[in-house]
Amino acid sequence: MAKKNTYSYQPKADEKIAKAAGHSLKISPKHSVEICRTIRNMYLEDAKAFLEDVIAKKTVVPFKRHNKKVGHRSDLKGWPSGRYPVKAAAAILKVLENAEANAENEELDVENLKLVHVCANRGVIIRGWTPRAFGRASPSNTPTTHIQIVLGEA
């Protein structure tokens, strides 16, 4: 029996929502947490524009938790440190577009959608080994991330 996909967001009884999830995406969990914190409670079009600007390296994502040895950005207002996590932003944008398609299928008003729930959780670690000199090997592990997005009408 397959495990049922559970969301950490529990909607109200009369709330119309659309959900989408990405499982075991090969992106950084730390970058994903920072992006999700930034786009939470944004309108759908604003979040898509923000992620496209991050991919084009026009907008900086503020790093508020995982910010050790992260450089300061002059174009970032209100917070000193930030980065351009392009790979994570592209993966989250795909999940966001999937949620938008699900909202259209649920006949929600796409112009008035808001991100009511966005979260990133650590997924499984894909173990790997890199051969080294003298018969040794060093671990080269790939972290994965689970993304959950829930859209609701504002």
Swiss-Prot record:
<dbReference type="InterPro" id="IPR005721">
    <property type="entry name" value="Ribosomal_uL22_euk/arc"/>
</dbReference>
<protein>
    <recommendedName>
        <fullName>Large ribosomal subunit protein uL22</fullName>
    </recommendedName>
</protein>
<keyword id="KW-0687">Ribonucleoprotein</keyword>
<dbReference type="GO" id="GO:0002181">
    <property type="term" value="P:cytoplasmic translation"/>
</dbReference>
<dbReference type="GO" id="GO:0003735">
    <property type="term" value="F:structural constituent of ribosome"/>
</dbReference>
<comment type="similarity">
    <text>Belongs to the universal ribosomal protein uL22 family.</text>
</comment>
<comment type="function">
    <text>This protein binds specifically to 23S rRNA. It makes multiple contacts with different domains of the 23S rRNA in the assembled 50S subunit and ribosome.</text>
</comment>
<keyword id="KW-0699">rRNA-binding</keyword>
<comment type="subunit">
    <text>Part of the 50S ribosomal subunit.</text>
</comment>
<dbReference type="GO" id="GO:0019843">
    <property type="term" value="F:rRNA binding"/>
</dbReference>
<keyword id="KW-0694">RNA-binding</keyword>
<comment type="function">
    <text>The globular domain of the protein is located near the polypeptide exit tunnel on the outside of the subunit, while an extended beta-hairpin is found that lines the wall of the exit tunnel in the center of the 70S ribosome.</text>
</comment>
<dbReference type="InterPro" id="IPR036394">
    <property type="entry name" value="Ribosomal_uL22_sf"/>
</dbReference>
<dbReference type="Pfam" id="PF00237">
    <property type="entry name" value="Ribosomal_L22"/>
</dbReference>
<keyword id="KW-0689">Ribosomal protein</keyword>
<dbReference type="InterPro" id="IPR001063">
    <property type="entry name" value="Ribosomal_uL22"/>
</dbReference>
<dbReference type="GO" id="GO:0022625">
    <property type="term" value="C:cytosolic large ribosomal subunit"/>
</dbReference>
<dbReference type="InterPro" id="IPR018260">
    <property type="entry name" value="Ribosomal_uL22_CS"/>
</dbReference>
